[in-house]
Amino acid sequence: MKLLAAVLVVVFGAPLQQAPELVAAKVAKLPAIDGKADDDAWKSARELKAGIDEPLEEKPKKMISLKAVHDGDSICILLVWEDPDKNDQHCPFAWKGSAYEPDEEKAEDFCSIGFALEGKFDSDMKAGVESRWDVWEWCAARTNPSGFAIDRTHAYTKAKPPEAVKSKKMTDRNQGQIYFSHPVDEGTPCFKKIEAPEKKGADVVPQYVPQTPAGSAADVQAKGEWANGKWTVEFKRKLNTGHKDDTAFASGKAVEFAVAAFDKCEKGDHVVTKTLVLKIQ
């Protein structure tokens, strides 16, 4: 089973003391966002090892390692998990006789980090809880070449969103209905989808190519590297971007979060942690 990561974060009250804590200590120098965990900041950071499995599994079988640091201006989060296979292609174009066709058997490893904007938080997407999250997504093929993450909002509502909002109706754990939408933040994203080339070049060419992000879509840096059967992924963002679609962090603030992992973009296994707490010193 392969793991990729997603961190979902929410501000809360009393329940914060009941969950394991990921402590983000203040450091003089933040780590370089290069997909490596050899910086001094990471060596001194406190590690949290969290169980990760299917949402309803009470005794997780896998573990994921988390660390966090900040410098008073920006925060960095490090995720490390075991994955025996490196999947860093996503539906590339493969030459088939006389034309390029998407190879849908190739799907990337994937992880995301989300922070609550409104409502009660539950790490289970099918909990049926109305809420909004600020979400960061790292993708081994689509985002990693650019050094940035997708920055978007997850919204869960009982009422159907306006027709202009692309949404999906899901059945929750109690057999109720909830609508899910996940628009990207305003601005230019860190990759774009291209048309298949008409003339043959390489046998396989990417369908998604990096581009320079701008606006709120450029808030989150992210870089991952696979080595020795593990993914190492680093994220970095300002504590407070000033954008309405981003969760604001601050020293002394405690925030609920969870980590989810996607094998080959959920064409394989999808796992998630129970609720954890990010504590910013």
Regions picked out by a protein language model, each given a short descriptive name:
Residues 3-12:
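Sec-dependent N-terminal signal peptides
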Residues 15-90, 198-203, 207-214, 259-281:
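Order/disorder boundary and secretion-linked terminal/linker segments
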Residues 16-36, 93-195, 227, 241-281:
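Acidic/polar low-complexity flexible segments
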Residues 64-67, 220-226:
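Beta-strand-rich interaction surfaces with strong enrichment in secreted/lumenal proteins
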Residues 72-76, 110, 228-234, 254:
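A generic structural signal for beta-strand entry/edge sites
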Residues 79-83, 233-240:
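Short, hydrophobic/aromatic-enriched beta-strand segments in well-ordered soluble domains
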Residues 179-223:
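Glycine-aromatic-enriched beta-strand/loop faces of beta-sandwich-type recognition domains
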